[in-house]
Amino acid sequence: MDIIQKISEDLSLKKKQVEAAVQLLDEGNTVPFIARYRKELTSGLNDEELRNLEEKLQYLRKLEERRESILHSIEEQGKLTEELKKEILAADTAVRLEDLYLPYKPKRRTRGMIAREKGLEELAKALLIPCANPEAEAEKYISPEKEVLTATDALNYAKDILAEDFSEDARLREWIRNKSLKDGFICSSLKEKEETPESKTYENYFSYDEKVQSIPGHRILALNRGGKEKILSVKLRFPEEEILHYIEEQVQVSKKGKCRPYLEEAIADSYKRLIAPSIETEIRNILTEKAEDGAILVFSDNLKQLLMQAPITGKVVLGWDPGFRTGCKIAVVDATGKVLDTTIIYPTPPKNQVKESMAKIHQLIQKHHVDIIALGNGTASRESEKVISDYLKEQKSSVKYVIVNEAGASVYSASKLATEEFPNFDVGERSSTSMARRLQDPLAELVKIDPKSIGVGQYQHDMNQSKLTEQLNKVVEDCVNKVGVDLNTASASLLSYISGISKTIAKNIVAFREENGAFKSRKELLKVAKLGPKAFEQSAGFLRIRGGKELLDMTSVHPESYSVAKEMLALAGIAENELLSGKGKEMGKILSSLPGGLKGVEQKLSVGEYTLKDIIEALAKPGRDPREDVPAPILREDVLELEDLKEGMVLQGTVRNVIDFGAFVDIGVHQDGLVHISALSKKFVKHPLDVVKLGDIVKVKVLSVDVARKKISLSMKDV
């Protein structure tokens, strides 16, 4: 198989693009590096396209390895014909390859094998020819020493051989699989006779069936979980009569005369005992894999939006980790994230020390000039919000508060990483510090947590964990490199996601910084232990230095392009220090007005179109953060209760999670409301991600409120 050609066709990319990308990947270049700094070679493939290409490349290379292994195995058995070899070489999917290999695959001792050992293969062939009198033919094979005592025994053994042969016919299996996928149903029922509190979750699936072809992924994952918990019985129902009729046609049973009953029995046995269970397992696996891929895609998109939330810079933040019995843990951090103060207060039940608690908060706000309170959304959050809101009203304070998603905070605060970062803090102090820092720079703080613990997925614990981890780590890597990091302030956790930087090198960078002080130039990276020329090439462009020796070090311009960037500045008549005052914004316009325009500049400086464009963009806004374009979180000063909601109310909210059937929106009542997929838009919506993404600020209308069950139904239509 021509892998390059196959990728080109499957992903609708030019062959040259694929060739270049594959070569770059094979040379050890990372996806973020290729996407950003090798656009000329790939004709501008972005990180998403490169990830898809990389995944396809890995799949096809594994397929080739498997193909070679299968050919070798069949050849060793002495059964590799030219026709079979041709079919194996032409197989373009793993399923097709395995179908062709099935008859030759080493397997445990089967009924068909036992029948062959007893010498009944010729009788099986005779039934297909067919013979005039199968019973008389069978008598020739009676052999007491082989335990074939009667003609009926012989015919039964012959049927076992035929059943196995039919089940291993690649063309039959392919047709049956496709037919079952197209016309099959997935059905579920309650396993136990009586309902239990645990089974209530799955009441929609107690008597349920849906076409395999159209069932959405989230239902497959729900059925899988119900089956795993032994609450649901889940089965597939296929068009059996049509399938049996098709096999009979292929075997040409109607022309077999007296052999017909035996062939029909062999076909029925083949399908029910061998083919159907095998195809059912395959289809369940196909559906699960597709559902998992869909769920991982949604999780990845949600994670990306969460990581790319707008940072709140230059603000002193008070982090508030709410609690009841153990109290509310407080930490104040300055604009750089440095911890200024910590305390613990008890404004919530059972102590209800509101007055004393808020006196402490008032003291901290005054002492450190706090701008914003970052309140975690966990246990006692609602009670804490009421206390904060009452305090702000009473004080007529300009301080605002924001509800911060604290998913994963408890995991982080008890982790080895948190212990290393804050050795003298207890778990509560670490958690409240994390609340504050999450608001200041979500990306820098969230990279410290296992992406699976961030809680923006669906059925995440029911899917392939290694695949999920791999995909989510790629998302984090792409986000971190898209934003870039400050080389002099970034944690080892953040640095470890930078292109070309391993966890060991990340720790070495921090150690070098602590020993030698701040980096003054990107070139100094080469002095870091284990950071060689290749790692420097891959990472340098994503690491920023503010106030260093080289002004270009604070931009996304790669050191390999510094000479070109400086020549461009000279052509535009702009001094490097003028970039800080915004003069770089004029560069594109100035260069375009030169004789020959930008094309002339490309030729004069021997630079590619993509690189030229990227340098112009980088110098227009040195140190620009792409997250600046994202809506800032909603700052609140008043509290809204669930009971305050009325049908028809129009509110502003933040999308907190996107799933297959809709989006959950935080409207400030400590219970996210659901905008069902049907209420997202007046137009048809294939998937919620086509309309909203996590972190979006949206207007919603209240459709209904169930206070007892804490359920809110919202709509984004007609608002």
Write out the residue ranges for each language-model feature:
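Short, ordered loop/turn segments at secondary-structure junctions
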Residues: 37-39, 128, 239, 322, ...
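A glycine-rich phosphate-binding loop feature that marks nucleotide/adenosyl-phosphate handling sites
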Residues: 178-186, 320-324, 379-380, 404-411, ...
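Accessory alpha-helical DNA-binding modules that contact the DNA backbone or grooves
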Residues: 30-31, 42, 46-145, 482-629, ...
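Duplex nucleic acid-engaging cores and interfaces of nucleic-acid transaction enzymes
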Residues: 49-52, 59, 63-319, 325-425, ...
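Long, charge-rich intrinsically disordered scaffolds of nucleic-acid metabolism proteins
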Residues: 96, 402, 408, 413-483, ...
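Long, charged amphipathic helices and adjacent flexible linkers at domain junctions
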Residues: 282-300, 453-484, 602-647
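Low-complexity, acidic/Ser/Thr- and charged residue-rich accessory regions of DNA metabolism proteins
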Residues: 141-151, 208, 237, 244-271, ...
